[in-house]
């Protein structure tokens, strides 16, 4: 038995196919979803989506949004998403280093919050690459 997974951003469909299982980062922690999961709606955190296709796992960096699960269908609506295999590792590492430097020199509450979000996004992209290496 499989699940129908659809990952959407405002600009494109990132994923639309059958999967065996997913592990989703939510605001209250990670949840595993198998076929016949109870219906839920949840906020999606900045983090990694792990997708199992038969014996292979695929990763995707998600940048926050919402997910709806029901009737063996999962719809994930996020601000942005990238498959781990599509992320340039050198560019992602450079972005992470810049985000870390910006976080260290952030002044004031607003700058600190914005720098922290940029840092979390950069770390997630690097983690998505490393999870498939």
UniProtKB/Swiss-Prot annotation:
Signal peptide: none annotated. Its main location: plastid. It holds the Pfam family ATP-synt_DE. It is a peripheral membrane protein. GO terms for cellular component: chloroplast thylakoid membrane; proton-transporting ATP synthase complex. It is found in: Plastid, Chloroplast thylakoid membrane. Keywords: ATP synthesis, CF(1), Chloroplast, Hydrogen ion transport, Ion transport, Membrane, Plastid, Thylakoid, Transport. One of its GO terms (molecular function) is ATP binding. F-type ATPases have 2 components, CF(1) - the catalytic core - and CF(0) - the membrane proton channel. CF(1) has five subunits: alpha(3), beta(3), gamma(1), delta(1), epsilon(1). CF(0) has three main subunits: a, b and c. Produces ATP from ADP in the presence of a proton gradient across the membrane. Belongs to the ATPase epsilon chain family. This is ATP synthase epsilon chain, chloroplastic.
């Amino acid at each position: 038995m499989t699940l129908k997974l659809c990952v959407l951003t405002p600009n494109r469909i990132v994923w639309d196919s059958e999967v065996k299982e997913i592990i989703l980062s939510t605001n209250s922690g990670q949840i595993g979803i198998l076929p016949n999961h109870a219906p839920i709606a949840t906020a999606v955190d900045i983090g990694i989506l792990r997708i199992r296709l038969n014996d292979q796992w695929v990763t995707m960096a998600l940048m926050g949004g919402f997910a709806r699960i029901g009737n063996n269908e999962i719809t994930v609506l996020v601000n942005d998403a990238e498959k781990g295999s599509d992320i340039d590792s050198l560019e992602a590492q450079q972005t992470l280093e810049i985000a870390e430097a910006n976080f260290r020199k952030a002044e004031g509450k607003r700058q600190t919050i914005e720098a922290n979000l940029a840092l979390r996004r950069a770390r997630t992209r690097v983690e998505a690459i490393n999870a498939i290496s």
